[in-house]
Structures are given as C-alpha cells and as structure tokens.
Amino acid sequence: MLFALDRKDYAGCTHVHRRDSARAVIIRSGCTAMVYSRKYDYYKFPGGGLEPHESAVAALQRETLEESGLRIIPASIREYGFVHRIQRSMTDETECWVQDNYYYICDAEAAVRPQKLDGYEAEEGFTLVFADPLTVIHTNRRPKQTPYDPVMFEREARVLEYLRLEKYL
C-alpha cells in the first residue's frame, strides 16, 4: 500500500459500496500521461473502475484506452502500488465508500487513438495531456468548485509526489 486516505467519518454507516479502480502511470520525457478535465480544471491518471469479474489489469487496459486513447503495451505493465480510500458517501450518509486504487507503471504505443468517453467524461472535456508533475500537483491542490470530493485530487497529487521521491520522475 502506498498510503491510505481514511476520513474516519463513517460511524453509523449501515452498508458499504466498494468500487476498486486501476490507473496507468505512463511516463514520457519526465511528464506523465494525465486526463485533464477542462470543465473543472483537475488532472487524473488514466484508468477507472473495475467491472464485475474484471481483473485490475484488464480494467487498466480498457479504461486507459477509452479515456485517453492510449493503448498500453501489455508486456510493460508493472505493479506500482495502491491507495486505499475509505469514507462516508457524499450522496448517502448511511453508506461507506471503500476503494482500492491500483497504480501500474506501463508504456503505451506511440499512436493515440480516438477516445471513447462516457457522457460525463465528454461533458467535462476530458483531454489527454502529458503534464509536468509539479503542474498537476499544484493544480489539483488549488481549491475548486466541482461535484467531486477533493480527496480524489489529493490522491493523484500524492501518488505523483511518491513517484518523484522514488525518482521515477
């Protein structure tokens, strides 16, 4: 485990919603592949939630291709670590949200394919960028008005800090 994001605000929750995810760490020339939300001004690593009965690696490949247009080279995939997140749901105070976010260092083919975005992703203007890690960290820590919990932005900033400390970037 890289680290945990535990709000400790879930006393009284009566049920758990679990949705694990897989995220790609693709590094080129000291920059990382990130999906940028033009609408809300934040960055996230390409990737997303695991479907029922889907492996983390399969979700990594599928979600990265859909969100960014980058096709991961399967032989390059290496586990980096995971971030454990647990907190009360933002929409249901009786629900505890639990998520393990699995990060994989990998390479992608040079060609960028068309994105296959979900409705909300297209509405947010998801765009693939290769970004300077410090720019991402600064942007994600700047206060913003979004429908999302700021823990998501902090998660990505902290993973980038770990990658910098470990000399990947």
Positions of PLM-derived features:
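A short coil-to-beta-strand element that immediately follows conserved catalytic motifs
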Residues: R71-F82
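A generic structural micro-feature
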Residues: V16-R18, E93-D100, Y120-G125
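Hydrophobic pocket-lining residues within nucleotide cofactor-binding pockets
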Residues: L50, V83, A108, P133-V136
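Active-site-adjacent beta-strand/loop module that shapes the phosphate/pyrophosphate-binding cleft
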Residues: R85-Q115, V129
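Nudix hydrolase/Nudix homology domain
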Residues: Y42, V112-L169
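Conserved Nudix-box catalytic region and its N-terminal flanking loop in Nudix hydrolases
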Residues: I27-E67, R71
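Short, solvent-exposed loop/turn segments at secondary-structure junctions
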Residues: V16, Y42-Y43, R85-R88
